[in-house]
Amino acid sequence: MEGIHHGGHGGARPSQSMAFPGFDADSHMMSDDFTFDSPFSSSGSSNANDGVLGNSIFPEWTNGAPRGESPDEMQRKDPLAAQIWKLYTRTKSQLPNQERMENLTWRMMAMNLKRKEREQQEREQQARASETVSPAPSGIEMRISDQVSSAGPDLSHDMNLDGTSDAMNLDDFIIPFDSPAEHPSHPSADRQFTATPTGSIPIKSRKDAMMEQSTAASFPRAPQDQRTNSEFGYVARRVRKTSVDERQFFAGLSVPTRKRPAEASPQVPPVSNAIVAALGIVSGLPDYSLDHPPSAFALPGNGTVGPRRPQHHHTHSNIPYGLDTYGLNEDHGINSAGPYQQNFHFSPSESPMTAGNPFSRLYTQTPLASSLNSTEFFSPPPSGYQSTVSTPQPIYEGEQSIFFSDAPSAESHSQRRIPNYIQQRQSNLSASLQPRYMYNMNGDSHQGNAVTGPPTTHVSGFSVPQPQHVNPAQVLGHGEFSTTAPATSMFTFGGDSDNEDDDGNFERGRMTMPNDFASMDESGDMSAGLHWDGGFPGSVQSLPGFSAQHRKHVTIGSTDMMDGPPEWNQGGTLGRGHGSVASVSDVRNQNQDPRRYGKVPRTASTPNAAALLRQSLNGSASGPPTNHPSPSTPPESGLSSAVPSRPGSPGGSKNGDPNAGPTTCTNCFTQTTPLWRRNPEGQPLCNACGLFLKLHGVVRPLSLKTDVIKKRNRSSANTLAVGTSRSSKKSSRKNSIQHAPSTSISSRINTSESPPSMTGSNTLGKPGVVPIAAAPPKSGPPAGVAQGRAGVQVAPRRQRRLEKAPIGSDQDPDDSPKSAAPTSRSKVVPLAPAMAPPAAANPANHSIAGGQGASQEWEWLTMSL
């Protein structure tokens, strides 16, 4: 009975009384029955083993294993298991608790098997350790090891058990890949060892090689060798658990993985040139970098004069006209961030997130400054696209543009067709991202709106062909274009300032725009730019020498209209040094008309700025103004037919449009907020939703909506002059230059008791709010009445959205003496310009969206300063 209490290798086992408490009274029967020469230990009991335990839970009973399950061999290996098995096979039909007995038997056998597996693994580890220490086992050592293995439990039997395939091991069925840990080593037969004279294996120092070959994580890996020619080629390669299981490439299996394979990552060379010089793998990479290259779309004149030449950086192509013959659109390995990367091509008046691929060869070369600045350059829509901070965007500086020819040809006289300027936009983008252009739109009220080039000998300007009339008298000529002006940084992301109402020094994220778009030829004809026809009333040129300017000039979504002049860089457009606050010295130093400035408006949700200007343009150029129900849906949006993903918010109330409603938050649809903000798409958000989105990064839930607006306890919160002083003070705190003229006589004032409602009802009456655009002027009282009512009206703060106020007219600059308007650089703006429309009061806000009087007032403002 000693084997029951102390079985195996000296390990304590549960006694018989513990395992079977009901058999204490029959110990003499157990001693008789469990003797190993019992007549019940016949071959019949071992034959019963095959039917009961013939499954794959225990490897001993699988097919292919040597059958040694006689009771004698079981007794030799594990006495307790043998005796319990004999008991069970004999009395399983008479036991009252046979299910419990069977369960207990299985559990005890499983414990024994686990213990044997642990012991076997320990022996294998010791054997491997002895192999690494000794170079080759001699004959004596091999005999000793054989004696040790035979003296202990049957090691060869255990090896054979492990060598068979286990039906419960799923790894054998997924990818048959060998590793040294799965199979025991056979030191005597399987491997050939070459003994060295010194008795040790010469292991080379691989530390230098590892330091030499360490590259960046984004660097493309060479095809992994099968390690057949290396020194340790017999060692199976360790599988590194990365994003892709590399075993499938070795096994030749196409096992789909859930993660993105590493081959779809951008193949960007590392930044350090020392690493690149030591590796021959760089020669297989395409010629691009993540730096800011002078691309083929870069500017010829950073103060230099000369024709534009395509930049041949690395690839010197012999193909004429610089045609793209590689078909990079079909190369899915180059699309660095999946299929969405090809939509980042920048177009003249559209955001980089256009659907389709209209100008891929022309606008691919626009440099996205870096990974961080490109985040400020384009903001992805609220969907699951990738981050530009973590995803590098490759730039093909060596590829040439296929759109324009490099040499003048006979076909260049004819207008080239732009195939499908923009495709249907993706439906997950919201309404503000619809493409809207001043050119290539339905000509309901805009006749002759084809974009044409001047009648030169070789016209590089392109046209969007429309079946409409082209007025040759209104085609812009040579003198309209500047070729020597320096390049200006034109676009900054609107989210880079904390408060949207501050004009600040936005020197951080920028993007450089070219001198002109079209003249790619070598002949020096720099005047054939991207020409807008000045004939149709939606054009900026219908206003004589004037175009609107806005505060931050960001194109995040698509733009409402092209407020820019025909040249994109007329005199530098506006120096970004003062955050789009043009100083008068900048204006005076320009040789061109000082009133011809303009930039792309902010977004489609800059409702009042673009729409009021368009209304005044339509009214001044074509007679009756065309009233639109909302500035967010202008008439130029004829190209866009995508359904918005959520109801579009009505734009800001226009003073001349009776149908326009107040600005509504696109998230909570409120109309009362102390400060209007914008989401990354440019749609208006209330202060609460905007702050919530900026702080938390998610949209503010509607359950948090409340109509109670908490105010700060300011003593003079309702006075207009203090509000304007606060806004100018904040602007001056950001080192921007503000010129606040004290206009006493010729200031435009309101004929109502409340200031005009601006974009999102932003007026100077609100503290810290610089309006975006002014309202179109209407006929008002004469100068005497304006002077008499200049400093009287102080509207209450709550009253500004309740009524739409017409605006007093401009006074002609001939009627207003210059001495009556002294200049003031004070931080506190006086009260009279606070009641005036903000374009006259605050030149930091150059959105003078007026008619003829607006350009005259700008001229007067320039002269007075």
From Swiss-Prot:
The keyword Transcription applies. A zinc finger (GATA-type) spans 665-689. Residues 582-592, 715-724, 737-764 have a biased composition (Polar residues). Residues 1-75, 115-140, 177-227, 557-605, 617-663, 713-854 are annotated as: Disordered. Residues 115-126, 180-189 have a biased composition (Basic and acidic residues). CDD domains: ZnF_GATA. Keywords: Activator, DNA-binding, Metal-binding, Nitrate assimilation, Nucleus, Transcription, Transcription regulation, Zinc, Zinc-finger. It holds the Pfam family GATA_AreA. SUPFAM superfamilies: Glucocorticoid receptor-like (DNA-binding domain). It comes from the Eukaryota. Residues 32-46, 771-786, 830-844 have a biased composition (Low complexity). GO terms for biological process: negative regulation of transcription by RNA polymerase II; nitrate assimilation; positive regulation of transcription by RNA polymerase II. It is found in: Nucleus. GO terms for molecular function: DNA-binding transcription factor activity, RNA polymerase II-specific; RNA polymerase II cis-regulatory region sequence-specific DNA binding; zinc ion binding. GO terms for cellular component: nucleus. Major nitrogen regulatory protein. This is Nitrogen regulatory protein nrfA. It comes from Penicillium urticae. The lineage of its organism: Eukaryota, Fungi, Dikarya, Ascomycota, Pezizomycotina.
